[in-house]
Amino acid sequence: MITHYSLPITRYPLPRFLTLSQIEFPSQFDVLVVGAGAAGLYTALCLPESLRVGLITKETVALSASDWAQGGIAAAIAPNDSPSLHIEDTIQAGAGLCDVAAVEFLAQQAPKCIESLVNLGVAFDRHGQALALTLEAAHSRNRVLHAADTTGREVTTTLTDQVLRRPNIQVIQQALALSLWLEPETGHCQGISLFYQGAITWVRAGAVVLATGGGGQVFAQTTNPAVSTGDGVAIAWRAGAILRDLEFVQFHPTALTKPGADRFLISEAVRGEGAHLVDNEGRRFAFDYHPAGELAPRDVVSRAIFSHLQRTAVDPATAHVWLDMRPIPEDKIRLRFPNIVKVCQRWGIDVFREPIPVAPAAHYWMGGIATNLKNQTNIPGLYAVGETASTGVHGANRLASNSLLECIVFGAQLANLTPADLIQHTETPALPTREFKIDASEWQHQQSQLAILREKLPRLVWQSAGICREQSTLSVAIATVKSWQQDFAALPLSQFLLSLQPNEPVSCNFSDTDQQLRLWAETGNLLDVAYLILKSAAFRIESRGGHFRLDYPHSNPDWQVHSLVQKHQWWQSPIMKS
């Protein structure tokens, strides 16, 4: 039995948010959790309270992709629903690549997870005393719980409040993880290197949990926040972790497309409640591509919009279609989607009188660090949870509102971690502190090079590995990214930091230290993530789920397998049956 479902609501005095200048960073924890979205927060809460836990986030605990999640969290709790139906829908959406055992575990644990969240104080919407359930695309039943259209914010706010009340959890904000710290003889993960307070330090841990979210910022069009730079996947890959299914990226069909506006996600729940997807003539064109129309799986709807614009728009790259909410009763719109109404109003759109301009954008990464049902990776002592992990649940295409659920169900597995599971390390003395120095003009030139790379890379990846891909553009993009990786490695800061020995601290004394070192680290991570996605997309010579190739437009039974990569080696691996 999994004990986390009876998580107590702790009532310790609420501490202030701590800045790095206010704390003394310990040199060792029992467990380090990197990332403070839903996966990281819930993992930290579920870890035994006897363990000393460090929760590391490069921003604040109030900023993550989970906080942006609108639609909700799926669970089969209705009388006419069941985990078996939830399993069927998830497998159907996954286009033949779901690991059945992982899907069964997810759906069967979902109702108890909802009970746990309610007990912790998450205020889901209700109809009277009953939890309100809505329908989303590719679900056969109303099973999506929500808190208006800001479910992610409600979940993360509640979890953050609980985390800050736990005396065994120390939250370290604005600290940037740079690399894993492996024991050279055993290959065990014994901690991380990270940047904080203008210095690089090494922190030991009996276990490291990566919960850093996705990598949407590698694409020019994305619904992800700026923090989503694929840090966990890149860090794990460089350390030798096995990664899985990196070519599968979910492009959300309906992101707000307005000059000057962020690509704000218009939740799938809007279409589930009855909104229509129409073209400039007001025609519901999605039915040309799938019998379910705008309620087809996300990859189908995204390609429908892409194909329709390619055929009808003068400039498909900047064109859009329309999402018309007017078929939904006005009172329901105000009740269910107040944030969407508010954001659209901010950009001059009255959803009660006119449709919303929308187009697809990168939204969710199905691939990630390969894990088992206990979140273990191939590196002893290293775990991964949430979007940064590949559990086998989503297959080639994630079912709507299964992402928050995955964070909670698999984060809960860390409740079973015991002191006996923690890697015991031999203490080694820290090496003398090195100082990074650079000429002012050279530093300015380096800043300019990083900024140019950061601007060019997402455009290249969007054009070559976006909704539709083919070998010719992938090959050119791979060669370009390799060249940029070489340019990045030749930077003075790269040469200095990549030459560090384990447990060798660094002090940095140059202007804008925090901002510039973060730019350096994120740019390096995005270059690696781009390379991995491009190579994985070229490796899979078929179309399936979130991976569509113009030169191989159909699924191939020989490719009903996972793609795995370790370092620079790619290979196929069979899916896991129940």
From Swiss-Prot:
GO terms for molecular function: L-aspartate oxidase activity; nucleotide binding; steroid dehydrogenase activity, acting on the CH-CH group of donors. It is an enzyme of class 1 (oxidoreductase). It comes from the Bacteria. Its EC number is 1.4.3.16. Signal peptide: none annotated. This is L-aspartate oxidase. Gene3D superfamilies: FAD/NAD(P)-binding domain, Fumarate reductase/succinate dehydrogenase flavoprotein-like, C-terminal domain, Succinate dehydrogenase/fumarate reductase flavoprotein, catalytic domain. The record marks E136 as: Important in orienting the L-aspartate substrate. Pathway: Cofactor biosynthesis; NAD(+) biosynthesis; iminoaspartate from L-aspartate (oxidase route): step 1/1. It catalyses: L-aspartate + O2 = iminosuccinate + H2O2. It comes from Nostoc sp. (strain PCC 7120 / SAG 25.82 / UTEX 2576).
